[in-house]
Design a protein with these regions (language model features):
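Charged alpha-helical initiation segments
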Residues: 1-42, 192-204
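Intrinsic-disorder-associated interaction segments
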Residues: 1-8, 12-15, 45, 73, ...
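Amphipathic, Lys/Arg-enriched alpha-helical patches that create a basic surface
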Residues: 18, 22, 121, 134-203
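Surface-exposed polar/charged interaction patches
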Residues: 22-25, 29, 62, 66, ...
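Short, hydrophobic, well-ordered secondary-structure elements
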Residues: 38-63
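Alpha-helical scaffold segments in carbohydrate-active enzymes
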Residues: 50, 54, 114-124, 190, ...
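Flexible secondary-structure boundary motifs
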Residues: 61-157, 166
Length: 204
């Protein structure tokens, strides 16, 4: 395989562009086609969290090459080498690099935690092996698929919005002002800035 090099933000943009295209596709589904909506919504939730993790990996790797953040380089590079789980990275890295922590107890941090929990329930799914009693017989080995069945069009769109909001919180810690969020999102996720107010990327 030939080696291909690209700008660090390229892969992040590709994942988020894929997610936006998926959200558009879901919106075009017939509302009665619940099966397709749930299939695409599940992929949307998974892709949103994956996109954030790739962003976190690349963004912090780029930052620790800058003079201001070189103090954290050995720490971040070692964690990258160990392939630290996303949960630990988002809790440890901002403090190590910026001297500030993300708040996971409320607001965007809590929304992202909830999204990550949903994603984990989808990708780490296992049969609950339940028994259903029916008149005259039992059905054994059934799985609780309530989480999957709860997915709808909003699930994927919300996942995209929460992912973007969470990335903006990392921008905030790095010193980027709110007025620059749309341009930073464009650079790092490929989201084209519009005339909408900055409030649209804040938590609802």
């Amino acid at each position: 395989m030939n080696k291909v090099v690209s700008s660090p933000n390229m892969i992040v943009c590709q994942y988020f562009q894929s997610l936006r295209r998926l959200c558009y596709t879901i919106e075009q589904h017939d509302e009665h086609n619940k099966e397709q909506i749930q299939q695409d919504a599940a992929l949307g939730v998974i892709l949103a969290v994956t996109g954030v993790e790739i962003f976190v990996n690349v963004y912090f790797r780029v930052l620790v090459d800058e003079e201001t953040y070189k103090h954290a380089a050995p720490y971040i590079l070692n964690d990258l080498k160990k392939q630290l789980p996303l949960e630990k990275k988002v809790k440890k890295w901002p403090s190590a690099v910026f001297g500030k922590k993300l708040n996971f107890g409320e607001g965007v941090g809590q929304l992202f935690t909830n999204l990550k929990i949903l994603r984990n329930k989808l990708v780490h799914f296992s049969s609950s092996h339940e028994t259903i009693d029916l008149p005259g017989h039992k059905i054994q080995g059934m799985a609780d698929t309530s989480i999957y069945s709860s997915l709808d069009t909003h699930s994927a769109i919300n996942a995209l919005e929460v992912a973007e909001q969470f990335i903006c919180e990392i921008f905030r810690l790095s010193g980027i002002g709110e007025k620059e969020f749309p341009h930073a999102l464009h650079l790092w996720t490929g989201k084209v800035p519009t005339n909408k107010t900055i409030g649209n990327i804040r938590p609802h």
